[in-house]
């Protein structure tokens, strides 16, 4: 339409780089593949960086990537490895209207810091789908961060957590407060990988304990977190020798408001006949700083 300025929402990161080449007749697969790499800046280079620049040269049957910093270079391994970035399947990359098939993709080192990529194929889906995402408010979060180096407590940390949870439940059941979430994230013992079952990692000589409470109101979350923290601080576990507190707190006050908590309430693919009908283009003309009617 000849607009001088385009204001648009971004729903698919590679499209910012791929839209103009596709409009000009370049291969959709190559344009999207290049866009998927460029939208991460220089992460595909060595050393990688999300705050440095990468240049892409798109040709009819391939594209070339070149970092603009003399301190970085692209290698076939670094570029190919980027395909795993935030992906569970490096050969099949779904997106609007289809997916990129990288089974036949070829990476070639053409000089010390440039890599040539070819062979990417775009496979259209049976129909066009729009991704719909939405969230809902589930409550308010309060956390407390603490640590322990007591080897006896560390050896019994799982049973201690279960006992503390049981005591919290028993206390708040008496007040009719049952709709809450209480969790203990233990860093130094699968704090990062605890979401995956069956992973038994090394237990460190010290643990960081993050107590998290989510409830309907911030006041309830504060109270639950405070009670859980106090209970764990003074919990008399089996074999305990220490008579003072079980936990060390790096901050005072020990509890922190984290505010509103949301969760996905809508995560859906909507099949449509024409995706453009949901995103109409409006042209607005300005002259001398004023909008023309």
List the predicted regions and their residue ranges:
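An acidic, phosphate/nucleotide-engaging active-site surface
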Residues: 1-8
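Small-residue-enriched flexible segments
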Residues: 16, 21-189
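Gly/Ser/Thr-rich loops at beta-strand to alpha-helix junctions
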Residues: 10-16, 216-218
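C-terminal non-catalytic interaction/assembly regions of soluble proteins
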Residues: 128-293
């Amino acid at each position: 339409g000849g607009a001088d300025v385009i204001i648009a929402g971004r729903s698919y990161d590679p499209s910012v780089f791929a839209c103009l080449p596709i409009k000009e007749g370049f291969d959709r697969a190559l344009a999207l593949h290049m866009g998927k790499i460029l939208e991460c800046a220089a992460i595909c280079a060595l050393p990688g960086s999300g705050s440095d620049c990468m240049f892409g040269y798109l040709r009819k049957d391939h594209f070339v990537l070149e970092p603009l910093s003399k301190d970085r270079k692209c290698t076939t391994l670094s570029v190919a490895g980027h395909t795993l970035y935030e992906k569970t399947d490096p050969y099949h990359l779904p997106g609007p209207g289809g997916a990129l098939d990288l089974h036949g993709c070829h990476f070639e080192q053409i000089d010390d810091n440039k890599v040539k990529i070819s062979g990417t194929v775009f496979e259209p889906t049976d129909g066009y789908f729009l991704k719909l995402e939405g969230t809902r408010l589930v409550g308010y979060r309060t956390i407390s961060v603490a640590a322990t180096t007591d080897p006896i407590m560390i050896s019994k940390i799982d049973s201690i957590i279960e006992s503390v949870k049981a005591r919290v439940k028993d206390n708040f059941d008496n007040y009719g407060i049952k709709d809450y979430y209480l969790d203990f994230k233990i860093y130094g013992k699968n704090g990062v990988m605890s979401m995956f079952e069956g992973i038994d990692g090394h237990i460190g000589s010290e643990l960081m304990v993050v107590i998290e409470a989510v409830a309907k109101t911030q006041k309830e979350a504060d109270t639950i977190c405070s009670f859980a923290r106090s209970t764990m601080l003074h919990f008399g576990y089996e074999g305990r020798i220490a008579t003072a507190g079980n936990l060390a707190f790096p901050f005072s006050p020990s509890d922190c408001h984290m505010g509103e908590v949301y969760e996905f309430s809508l995560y859906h693919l909507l099949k449509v006949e024409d995706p453009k009908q949901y995103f109409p283009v409006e042209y607005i003309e300005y002259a001398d700083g004023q909008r023309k009617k």
